[in-house]
Amino acid sequence: MTSLIKPLAQASAALALCAGLSSPSFAAATAPVQTAPTIFSPGVISGAGHDAAPAFTPDGDTVYFGRQAPDTAAIMESHRIADGWSEPRIADFSGEWSDMEPSMAPDGSYMVYVSNRPARAGDKPGDGFYNGKAWPGKASALWQVRRTGKGWSAPERLPEQINRSTSIYAPTVAADGSLYFMQPNTKTGNFQLFRSQMRDGRFEEPQPLPFSGGEQNDVDPAVAPDESFLIFGSRREPASKSMDLFVVFRGGAGWGTPQWLGDVVNGPNSDAEARLSPDLKTLYFSSERTVPVGYPRTREQTRADLKRIAAWDNSLYNIWQVPLRPLLEKYRGEFGAR
């Protein structure tokens, strides 16, 4: 959720990496040094708007992401070029309704996203309700587009057992088609995380994840293709004042206890909208952090600051990136030690 406050071979490679991350030889390796997050494509993909939730094609050469302001949102498309990324354009299936939070299936055959598009043509968007208040015209549901020989299919609304809530956000797709997402707890109004098992081509009834009970806001799940781990945003301790990122692993006994990703990944303000690169080497997330400055400064430094602020560094969500492997190694080791 945003500001609420080649093919199968590559998918198989990603699954193999997931398995390798849990192997004894991997766990025994020397932990790589964790590096600080860096801004992703500043001024192009991370721009002056509220940018979040990158979804990459399996080859990593095309990215879809959400760009929004308080009353409008669209899914954007950009392609890798020699010196970075192309100027984003509105994705072919977006632009008529408020669309956000695309999530690519690991094999690239379809994409699920959030939209206020009404279920019936001709209707107006309904009202959403979460965090104890109504949001007129901001009902949301999960929709899907499928890859065709000519691009993307027309949007299809996911079935009603998925879209019962008027405020459903942040889809993420596992390799077997199972779907994770967030929706409000019916008693507290806080967002909690759900999973719907895909079985025989159909979604089963969504079930809340055992570590997410609605006591506080849990948002934006990003699940590994093999469902061995999940990264999400939460207001749980120690993130009581802002949204921070947590990781949780699944072992033989099920899901473990969520672990805070620390103050190298998490900044002083909100960090959420986690996404995983197709090769599972990079964690992407959206953050309100800004580039720190010191004083005194030269006029040249200030001019550079103002140029950067106009391009992207303005306290809105931008997309940041950090190596994923060191994080998984560190926190999986702590999970295994418990």
Regions found by a protein language model. Name each.
Residues 7, 16, 26-29:
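Low-complexity, intrinsically disordered segments with a bias for serine/threonine
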Residues 2-13:
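Bacterial N-terminal signal peptides that target proteins for export
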Residues 11-23:
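Bacterial N-terminal signal peptides
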Residues 27-338:
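Short, conserved micro-motifs composed of acidic
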